[in-house]
Amino acid sequence: MKDLLNLLKNQGQVEEFDAIRIGLASPEMIRSWSFGEVKKPETINYRTFKPERDGLFCAKIFGPVKDYECLCGKYKRLKHRGVICEKCGVEVALAKVRRERMAHIELASPVAHIWFLKSLPSRIGLLMDMTLRDIERVLYFESYVVIDPGMTTLEKGQLLNDEQYFEALEEFGDDFDARMGAEAVRELLHAIDLEHEIGRLREEIPQTNSETKIKKLSKRLKLMEAFQGSGNLPEWMVLTVLPVLPPDLRPLVPLDGGRFATSDLNDLYRRVINRNNRLKRLLDLSAPDIIVRNEKRMLQEAVDALLDNGRRGRAITGSNKRPLKSLADMIKGKQGRFRQNLLGKRVDYSGRSVITVGPTLRLHQCGLPKKMALELFKPFIFGKLEMRGLATTIKAAKKMVERELPEVWDVLAEVIREHPVLLNRAPTLHRLGIQAFEPVLIEGKAIQLHPLVCAAYNADFDGDQMAVHVPLTLEAQLEARALMMSTNNILSPANGEPIIVPSQDVVLGLYYMTREAINAKGEGRVFADLQEVDRVFRAGEAALHAKIKVRINETVKERDGSVVKNTRIVDTTVGRALLFQVVPAGLPYDVVNQPMKKKAISKLINQCYRVVGLKETVIFADQLMYTGFAYSTISGVSIGVNDFVIPDEKARIIGNATDEVKEIESQYASGLVTQGEKYNKVIDLWSKANDEVSKAMMANLSKEKVIDREGKEVEQESFNSMYMMADSGARGSAAQIRQLAGMRGLMAKPDGSIIETPITANFREGLSVLQYFISTHGARKGLADTALKTANSGYLTRRLVDVAQDLVVTEIDCGTDQGLVMTPHIEGGDVVEPLGERVLGRVIARDVFKPGTEDVIVPAGTLVDEQWVEFIELNSIDEVIVRSPINCETRYGICAKCYGRDLARGHQVNIGEAVGVIAAQSIGEPGTQLTMRTFHIGGAASRTSAADSVQVKNGGMVRLHNLKQVERADGNLVAVSRSGELAIADEFGRERERYKLPYGAVISVKEGEKVEAGAIVAKWDPHTHPIVTELKGTVTFVGMEENITIKRQTDELTGLTNIEVLDVKDRPAAGKEIRPAIKMVDASGKDLYLPGTDVPAQYFLPANALVGVADGAQIGVGDVIARIPQETSKTRDITGGLPRVADLFEARRPKEASILAEVSGTIAFGKETKGKRRLVITPTDGSDPYEELIPKWRHLNVFEGEQVNRGEVISDGPSDPHDILRLLGVSALAKYIVNEIQDVYRLQGVKINDKHIETILRQMLRKVEISESGDSSFIKGDQMELTQVLVENERLAGEDKFISKFTRVLLGITKASLSTESFISAASFQETTRVLTEAAVTGKRDYLRGLKENVVVGRLIPAGTGLAYHSERKRRRDADKPLRVSASEVEAALTEALNSSGN
């Protein structure tokens, strides 16, 4: 027996390894794996079901079918272990060896491996420098290829068809060698001298000029170097020996009725063996060449189908017309080996059931049905029963459990005590989709779930199911309790706000109990303390909403942690006083002295967590829930039809609108307005009417008249049930109430256009058939959208997780002082996100000074918490440089300082936190809430009148940012730069609003001037683009000849004449080359120069420009000499929602992207080519001018002679992130992408912390492109990992050599995932074949640094608690100790890690 145990123990030995290398297998290697050659295509005998000898299931080769029993039955039992039977040749061993023993097939003719041939770029093609077409013609026996030309005129690698071959034979005889088929390819590959070729290529590359050629050569060079470095030989890409998979991995199972269920691989192997044997026979018989050739081609095709069916030609199908599943299909795709078995395993000790509400549970509990618990905890129960002596053997214990004896239930209760279980609800979109609870045994068959965790699970009780998992080992239980317990997950990892927040009934109850009513019973009474209020309320002497005075004792926790007790009398209501009883000590009374709406409750829990800590908050949340449920029951709030009060004004508003529509219709009938104008006007009218109705309705609903104590009639907030539900945030919104009690309003057709006739009825009045029919469009589209959205959102999450999976916090501080400049996010004059919110939980990168002084008020390295935020706001700082994941210099992973606060815990992030995955989940999880639509700007939205002035909302001081301006004679300023901004700061100097100022805007205030709210500080004409002079003088016209380059127009109304410049295509031949311009000269006629330059002041006029001055006129500074009419931009669809987020993360270049200036300098326009304008920028530093061709239809914002800075917008359009990175750098790119993505989420009301987006962005910026190789081994134009390049440059700098220079590259998330260092991670993501082919050829090593790779090889992940295990192993590896780490050592390392992380 002992022997057996030792044997089993040895079987379980795991090889310890630190990297996995993938490469090409040489024929010798394949033979060394093999336990014999498969010679026959037979599988098993259909009568005896015994494997045939030398066949695909041969027991001699692969091992016995039954444990320790040879095939003929001569040797049985364990004692003969290792004996080889002399009769049948089978070794006596475990049948399990049939899963690991391989065989081989000796191929009669070499066969090219289809992956290296067809997987683009073709590796065989690159090495041989032949096209794929040519190689295929050789392989499939259509042409000869010259292998050795000898002394003839032929060239090596030249293709010959049959005729040419026979001609060559006649001419040269046997002086040359030309063959066909895979052996020819193998010969050519064998003949390649890698070292010589590499040397030749390295010399050739610097001498080539054409870009494409350099690309091709460097591709070849890279491949050759990869082969040389990996020890792979090129000829191994052609197989001479084919390995055979162990038979238990391609099973053949007899079904009843004499049929067999078989793996497709057996069919594919059978074809290969049949053709191979036939070919051997033909070669022995020395058959005619043409027959042999055909057989060889068929063998090649059979092997192709086995390796990757359907890659070349039509897929081979089985009897049922279904393509056979080849080896490649086994590993790729969702059902392949990687995603189905290695990354997604099924879990034992688990069960699932429907969930129902457990309103009496505490937050850390869940109700578990007894039946389930009994099954899940079986082994524990067996153990306990034996330990107690209630059962003697496991078998007896099993019987007891099956009979469900009473003592079993006692034991179960004991086993379950303090043994947490994990609850999971699919889809698990973020880490809060699996949490740990302590089970409470319940009768019934449904799992009970605590209502407050529903938000995290996104669960509801309409039939949702959840799975239960039991953590078995002590470590697992410890982690479940310490890290995954629901009480430890109060804050959301996405934004750091509480996620355990009451909703619906609870909110309604709390809101109801904290509302005040006028003249309620007991109003105006004064109470000594809360207990008295409680007694009086219970006795029915005071109503819940009565306004009272009460004396309270509150304890308030101060900033420094000291506790202040004070007693005061407050004006409040009975309900609020009752609610204060459950508020933990440390929070002031003011937190409950308001109507508790959803937002207020969320804020309250957040404050509670920050002030009094986790434990108190959990107890408080539970109490809040119980209170809320109790009072929502007492309130009896429910909806009746009479609650939907329809406003009296509705009929009048709709009547007026109908009349106006009739008026427009008659205008249309008489031809005064066009169809489009009519449509737009009507839709505008109805949306206005709709708004009026809903305003009237809300005014009606939200107030009610009551009599106060003096008998006067006063208004108070309404107690209408529906209004209370919406107002409290429990359910419903103004928009929904509008449909119930106002009017449904305008409906859209499925294509997104709005139907002109709105639904004037509401749901209380009921819809007519037509109205109902119109409204079905929208409902149906909604359902279709939702289905698509879920899939798209899931795929986005998967790509995000894949790109960021290996990003883990690996050190405390990387020591960089780089960072992002944070400013308040201001849009159209509103502060969308104040600075405080943006820097909360971040580390300051550089000292912050008090404005206007040199005093450091926030030192670098400070982690900004809520108190610092208040401090920063008080000192009115408007920009701070903070550390960011994008700038972190940690090599593998990221440092805690650059990441900042762990949002779900509220302190600095611990080492080992998997911040990449958290970021991906935080961005992906709300994906289902985003819309799928692309918004058409049409109807009401498109005609928000173009902005033509800046009107200040709040008063304050004017600040002008990077604005070039000139002062006009009347004292006003005129903007002459395009990127200028005007900001308004309050009395503390904090920016409150910010506006863009276009070129030519007239500004009526100066820097530092005080303005009142509502003042208009700047004006411009939105429909024309002015050309403004920057100096005074006399105008002279150059090249402006009437009817050749210009034409005069007289305005009929005003009688003024304008000069219009003709478009080039409208000019007569004489004017084609002339470029009209306006030149400025002084009184004596000498040229004037632009201020500060030696460029003459000459303004070239583009087509259609209108000139408003006469030749020889005197003009002053800042006057407008010409205007260019701007057609209002054609309506662009804005991509919104999920597709927009995906576009940004995939770094897709937008269509018609904006054009940015490549260099700083002066603009000029060169000669026009067909349909394009030539833009020339002459740099200020005197280097070569930069030229670019721009299509004519692009509208440019710049003029001849104007100065631009690098990265300034020349032509409007959506921004291209690649351009921003190239011209403006990483910080500008980060700012752009973060703001764009946040805009999409903000529109849906979803909050995500910026750092998650930055974390993903860091992964997209991993690669760099080498621009100068210096003394490094890199090739110019190569894409390399940034870390690799930095390591190499450090080495070169240490040896005083030239370092390589590089530019950052932005990759989309899919591309970034596929180009990761780990091939296991990339292969399990997408394009498995391509990734593995590339990895094998280059002999890649995977150092298993990421999470995915470690999951695949079945190890603890190097994150969280697994990091301790990995760092311990690394320590041992460095110290050359044995690598097996025992549990106790891991525990020691863990304790140390936990102690060092400071909490």
UniProtKB/Swiss-Prot annotation:
Taxonomy, superkingdom: Bacteria
This enzyme's EC code(s): 2.7.7.6
Co-factor: note: Binds 1 Mg(2+) ion per subunit. Binds 2 Zn(2+) ions per subunit.
Reactions the enzyme catalyzes: RNA(n) + a ribonucleoside 5'-triphosphate = RNA(n+1) + diphosphate
Keywords: DNA-directed RNA polymerase, Magnesium, Metal-binding, Nucleotidyltransferase, Transcription, Transferase, Zinc
InterPro entries, per the entry: DNA-dir_RpoC_beta_prime, DNA-dir_RpoC_beta_prime_bact, RNA_pol_asu, RNA_pol_N, RNA_pol_Rpb1_1, RNA_pol_Rpb1_3, RNA_pol_Rpb1_3_sf, RNA_pol_Rpb1_4
Protein name stated in the entry: DNA-directed RNA polymerase subunit beta'
Organism: Pseudomonas putida (strain ATCC 700007 / DSM 6899 / JCM 31910 / BCRC 17059 / LMG 24140 / F1)
Gene designation: rpoC
